[in-house]
């Protein structure tokens, strides 16, 4: 370490000298933890860890096409083991596409973080302190583990962002034609850039929590209105859409300052809605991206404010058709609108209200806060609320639209879910009964592909929404406001039962709305685990989706289950960027419970999570590039992820091969031996077709090598019971997870011992009811697994065995 001394520099006689003062170091840096081996890692520093994962969980590719057209030497046919003009083969080409997708996702969150941090530093100063509440002492666990710094101020977050941005550029460079030729190294780069994505997310959410005073790790946050029919149509309605709350916040501030917050409806779509409710609990949530056209076509907004990410690319066109003024705010989506930053507020309001301009680009948050309420009130006075919640002017107009249909089935062929719109139309034409059309609404993504394909230009979405209007309007519920990080005290309480298996697992429901069936399936899947005392954490679109679905008693899951991070708890961390707190919780278990150091120590922490923390990510409706990078970042951390059937379109899965016995081993620090183990977890990324398959996979992937007898018994009980419930028999692979008779579910022990003896050839001592021979390995209470040689050497004090 260096010693700081006072000194002087005389510059009065210097010529042609430029002096720049960077970060001023006032005192020696606090040594909060010894630095690990990989602070601010580059592409290569964690490559060895990635290759260990990829050796066990081999990439499986499901290309949507067998050609490449990424450069002008193409398109190149890569089928039948052919190579392209640049020499690339099909698998490597798909690995490159996956890497590009992860780069896009990571850049979205990191650019969001950069925009937010720079703005907040300008507003609050770079010395504004990071305070996440008295119960969070291990703040920024991802930044600590990856970047190796302990951020104390907003200014410190720039250091983490500088690292993330550099790595994103380096990985994106590798995808240029004529670079990488190894699919495994592309996958390693995808993992690397996705880890940077997690850093970007953590920076963004920490910044907005501390600057905007969002809830700070509070389990019992307010419940807010969620769903289509949430707004009072007798009030002017301001609708925000996107993922950056920077531009929506001033609207709430302006209304509060004017004492008029109760005279307006302030509601949102997508993650800006989440973060608006974290800032002001009077805000409301319409829903995810699939509700954007629903809300616009119903004429609900009197003004719309768009920022960035997951917003329809025809938003302006859709708003123009309904006479809804649009204020675009983000440089990521200026939407071809004129920049009115220099205009006075009155001129902007007049241009929008008069219809001279259908929309404006206004990247100044404070002006947005003033303009939006004035425009909304003026537009509302024009129609008096009469246009709200109307898809057609009359029933006759609805039937006139339905009668245009000739059942050509173009809509069916283009629909992502192949919904039988033709049958619903035909039934309505013959009988006047809209029930078959109404049934389609629950599964409709409102993507508009059907309308594009229709030769009669039928407003199919309007028809479907109007057919199910009563149910759609009343599909309202409650979402618990995003709480942000998990408390250290919560981690301290659940760390041991999670690692030992007494809490059977953590299910992290994160992702988009591209569901294969009705939205209620996400509730059914998650409630199965809540009832079984798993911890369920959620964020983003999934978090708001489950706030819309009620049970027979009229309650949502948020109203039935507590918000604390404990067995049977349902935790909403917040928006997309709040996903970071879910990964952060896994990291904090390793640190707070197991005392593993975090600083620049990524591989050891990920190794700990893989072998001990029974957490599984779940994205039932994956759709975006951000979802791809979020999932891949979890994979690098050792957390498996289950995706719905549309997840196959990401083109790649990480699936282990249990029959390859030589792939399933660990170093046991206690016995100083290389030990062959059960395949747990046996996949890092896997797609499922049905909700039944999703439930069973999630339960199975919570099993970890480090489970105690009691923990394995609990996990096997749930796995077997769920398989029997949904498939009617025992799972094919249950026996590989049995290490001793104590692992077996108590009420089925005798039955299962008999099955092991008769069907699997195991030797059973029936007098003692003990397993004598058969398991892959026997249970050892001191078992201490790792797959990282350096971790073994660190704790065993010797070279790893061969």
Swiss-Prot record:
[4Fe-4S] cluster 3 binds at residues 405, 408, 411, 454. InterPro entries: 4Fe4S_Fe-S-bd, 4Fe4S_Fe_S_CS, CdhA, HCP/CODH, Prismane-like_a/b-sand, Prismane-like_sf. SUPFAM superfamilies: alpha-helical ferredoxin, Prismane protein-like. Its cofactor is [4Fe-4S] cluster; [Ni-4Fe-4S] cluster. CO binds at residue 109. It is an enzyme of class 1 (oxidoreductase). [4Fe-4S] cluster 2 binds at residues 68, 71, 76, 86. It comes from the Archaea. GO terms for biological process: acetyl-CoA metabolic process; response to hydrogen peroxide. It catalyses: CO + 2 oxidized [2Fe-2S]-[ferredoxin] + H2O = 2 reduced [2Fe-2S]-[ferredoxin] + CO2 + 2 H(+). The keyword Oxidoreductase applies. GO terms for molecular function: 4 iron, 4 sulfur cluster binding; anaerobic carbon-monoxide dehydrogenase activity; hydroxylamine reductase activity; iron ion binding; nickel cation binding; peroxidase activity. Residues 395-424, 435-464 form the 4Fe-4S ferredoxin-type domain. [4Fe-4S] cluster 4 binds at residues 415, 444, 447, 450. Its EC number is 1.2.7.4. Pfam families: Fer4_8, Prismane. Keywords: 4Fe-4S, Iron, Iron-sulfur, Metal-binding, Nickel, Oxidoreductase, Repeat. Part of the ACDS complex that catalyzes the reversible cleavage of acetyl-CoA, allowing autotrophic growth from CO(2). The alpha-epsilon subcomponent functions as a carbon monoxide dehydrogenase. Cluster B is an all-cysteinyl-liganded 4Fe-4S cluster; cluster C is a mixed Ni-Fe-S cluster which is the active site of CO oxidation. Cluster D is also an all-cysteinyl-liganded 4Fe-4S cluster that bridges the two subunits of the CODH dimer. Contains two additional 4Fe-4S clusters, dubbed E and F, that probably transport electrons from ferredoxin to the B cluster. HAMAP family: CdhA. This is Acetyl-CoA decarbonylase/synthase complex subunit alpha 1. It comes from Archaeoglobus fulgidus (strain ATCC 49558 / DSM 4304 / JCM 9628 / NBRC 100126 / VC-16).
